[in-house]
C-alpha cells in the first residue's frame, strides 16, 4: 500500500501545480485530465522516442483547466475528460478550429484495497453498503467529469441517498484515488484507467455498467495560445494512431469509432 500511497500522492501534488514556466524548445505544454496520468506518461515516452519532442504535462480536473485556459493559462493542448470543455473553448475562439477530437471514452469502477473485507467484484453496489465502509471517495462533481458520472451511477443504482453523507470529494479523480489508497476512505468510485495502473491494479474492483451514467467522452484540442502548433498537431496525430490507441486501451479506455491511424476530428 505504501507504493500506492506514494504514487498517488505524487500525482495529486503534480495536479495541484499549474506549470507557468516558458516552454523549452520542442516541448509541448499539455493540460491533461488526472485520469490520464499513467496512460499519458507511457504515451508521452513513446511519442518522444519516435519524434524527439517532449511533452510537459500538468494533471488536474478538466473543469479547473477550462477555467484556467479562459483566464490565459499558457498551454498548447487540452486533453479533457469531458469533451464539452474543449468544445466550449472552440466556440469561444480560444482553440484552433477543426482540431477537436474525441480520443476516448472513460469507465468508472468501485475500487477497494486488496486487504478490504468486502469484494466489489462479488458484491457490486452492495460493497458500498457493507459495515466498515464509512467513507466513499469520488471526484468533485462540480468540475470533474468522473465525479458527475459517479453521482449519476449512484442515483441510478438507487443508493445515492443511503451513501451521500459518506461521500468525500477529491479535487480530481487522482485525489479521490489517494483517499482510498491512504485509508482516508474505505472505497472509491474511480476511473478504470487509474485502477488499471501499476500502483492500483492489485486492488479489488468492479466495473460499473456503462449504461448507469452518461458516456464519459474525452476530448482533445489545440489551443490558440499554443506556441508549438506543429508539435501539438504531432501529439494529437500520435494520440489517434494505432500505437497511441493501444496504450489507451491498455488502461481501460474505450476508443471511439474510427479511432486509430485514420481517425478524423469530431
Regions of interest found by a model, annotated:
Residues 1-12:
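Bacterial N-terminal signal peptides that target proteins for export
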Residues 11-15, 264:
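Intrinsically disordered, low-complexity terminal tails and inter-domain linkers enriched
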Residues 21-25:
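Sec/Tat signal peptide C-region and signal peptidase I cleavage site
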Residues 26-59, 63-73, 80-83, 87-96, ...:
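Exported/periplasmic ABC-transporter solute-binding proteins
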Amino acid at each position: 500500500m505504501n507504493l500506492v500511497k506514494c504514487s498517488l500522492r505524487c500525482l495529486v501534488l503534480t495536479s495541484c501545480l499549474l506549470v507557468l514556466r516558458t516552454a523549452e524548445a520542442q516541448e509541448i505544454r499539455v493540460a491533461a485530465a488526472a485520469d490520464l496520468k499513467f496512460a499519458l506518461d507511457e504515451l508521452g515516452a513513446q511519442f518522444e522516442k519516435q519524434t524527439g519532442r517532449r511533452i510537459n504535462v500538468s494533471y488536474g480536473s478538466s473543469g479547473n483547466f477550462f477555467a484556467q485556459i479562459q483566464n490565459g493559462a499558457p498551454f498548447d493542448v487540452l486533453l479533457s475528460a469531458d469533451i464539452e470543455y474543449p468544445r466550449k473553448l472552440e466556440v469561444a475562439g480560444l482553440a484552433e478550429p477543426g482540431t477537436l477530437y474525441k480520443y476516448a471514452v472513460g469507465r468508472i469502477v468501485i475500487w477497494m484495497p486488496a486487504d478490504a473485507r468486502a469484494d466489489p467484484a462479488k458484491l457490486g453496489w452492495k460493497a458500498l453498503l457493507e459495515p466498515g465502509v464509512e467513507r466513499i471517495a469520488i471526484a468533485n462533481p462540480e468540475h470533474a467529469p468522473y465525479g458527475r458520472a459517479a453521482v449519476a451511477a449512484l442515483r441510478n443504482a438507487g443508493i445515492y441517498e443511503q451513501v451521500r453523507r459518506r461521500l468525500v470529494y477529491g479535487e480530481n479523480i487522482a485525489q479521490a484515488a489517494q483517499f482510498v489508497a491512504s485509508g482516508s476512505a474505505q472505497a472509491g468510485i474511480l476511473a478504470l484507467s487509474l485502477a488499471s495502473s501499476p500502483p492500483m491494479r492489485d486492488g479489488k474492483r468492479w466495473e460499473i455498467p456503462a449504461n448507469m451514467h452518461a458516456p464519459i467522452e474525452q476530448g482533445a484540442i489545440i489551443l490558440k495560445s499554443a506556441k508549438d502548433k506543429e508539435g501539438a498537431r504531432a501529439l494529437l496525430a500520435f494520440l489517434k494512431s494505432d500505437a497511441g490507441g493501444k496504450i489507451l486501451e491498455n488502461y481501460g479506455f474505450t476508443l471511439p469509432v474510427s479511432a486509430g491511424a485514420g481517425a478524423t476530428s469530431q
